[in-house]
């Protein structure tokens, strides 16, 4: 039961819109990791996407300060990209040499779950509006994978004698990069928002939170979230 003066346990349900920024640090083609050349393109190294997901919280209101535990699951991101480039290497004596480069990439990223603990301070202003700020620490589980293949083909096109051109394959090479990880880390974030008291027990909540999930091996992941929800105090 409610203890009066705004104190008591509460539950909250939110619908959140998340902007997700995922940065992968795959081996480069130069520098200290040049012996581990990666075929991963910039598109999969620096991913910006978004998702909509539910979030539930259980907490206690001390009449100014609040503490809460929350849980959320995020949408799985996946994409694929194919590109081809043909570069002319030589063209003389009715013989033309070209280099064809094909890249096929398939990637997934899934913030499977986030279990957080937050401390929030409500500013008591006149009226029913209550701005708040807070901090959050969370245990996150992330899965990601990449499958990238780069194939090059060098071929000769001969038009000697004015006959129909004949194409000869001279050389083929193929490089691949495959990686799959399932990682758990503790990250930190900040919270801000405004609550509006519909009734003494029911509050409409609109909020923002930034969370840095920590460095997940060769991946950095952060989210910006805007949410709308309701909070009920018992």
Curated annotation (Swiss-Prot):
Residues 1 form the signal peptide. InterPro entries: OMP/PagP_b-brl, Porin_opacity. GO terms for molecular function: porin activity. One of its GO terms (cellular component) is cell outer membrane. Keywords: Cell outer membrane, Membrane, Signal, Transmembrane, Transmembrane beta strand. Transmembrane segments: none annotated. Pfam families: Opacity. SUPFAM superfamilies: OMPA-like (SSF56925). It comes from the Bacteria. It is found in: Cell outer membrane. Belongs to the opacity porin family. Implicated in a number of adherence functions. OPA proteins are implicated in pathogenesis and are subject to phase variation. This is Opacity protein opA51. The gene is opaB.
